[in-house]
Amino acid sequence: MKYLGAYLLATLGGNASPSAQDVLKVLEAGGLDCDMENANSVVDALKGKTISEVIAQGKVKLSSVPSGGSAPAAAAPSGGAAPKAEEKKKEEPKEESDDDMGFGLFD
């Protein structure tokens, strides 16, 4: 994936047909480890294709991947209902207002 990204960055940078060496330069500039064999395979696979074609093919492939399962079915209600626990209302002490403490933000 990083080789594909580097290839696309080189293409966006103005290089219409990046070589494996160009891909490696982009990756090294980002501080990433590089493998010439992987760079060559990506360049060979993308040779003669435009960015638009690569993105369109990627969209087609991503649309065929399932993106999640169906929602789980709701559980059937049990025979007896448990009594609801009474909610206790806590009275929270009112906090003192910090509106005027004798000084302003822009004084």
From Swiss-Prot:
Compositional bias ranges of the Basic and acidic residues kind: 84-93
Pfam families: Ribosomal_60s (PF00428)
Keyword hit for Hydrolase: no
GO biological process, alphabetically ordered: cytoplasmic translational elongation
Keyword Ribonucleoprotein assigned: yes
Region described as Disordered: 63-107
UniProt keyword terms in alphabetical order: Phosphoprotein, Ribonucleoprotein, Ribosomal protein
Biased composition (Low complexity): 63-83
Modification after translation (UniProt): Phosphorylated.
An annotated GO cellular component: cytosolic large ribosomal subunit
Gene Ontology MF, one: structural constituent of ribosome
Gene3D superfamilies, A to Z: 1.10.10.1410
InterPro entries to which the protein is assigned, alphabetical: P1/P2_N_sf (IPR038716), Ribosomal_P1/P2 (IPR027534), Ribosomal_P2 (IPR044076)
Functional note: Plays an important role in the elongation step of protein synthesis.
The family this protein is said to belong to: Belongs to the eukaryotic ribosomal protein P1/P2 family.
Complexes and interactors: P1 and P2 exist as dimers at the large ribosomal subunit.
HAMAP family: Ribosomal_L12_arch (MF_01478)
PANTHER family associated with the record: 60S ACIDIC RIBOSOMAL PROTEIN FAMILY MEMBER, LARGE RIBOSOMAL SUBUNIT PROTEIN P2
Protein's name according to its UniProt entry: Large ribosomal subunit protein P2
Lineage, top ranks: Eukaryota, Metazoa, Ecdysozoa, Nematoda, Chromadorea
Gene behind the chain: rplp-2.1
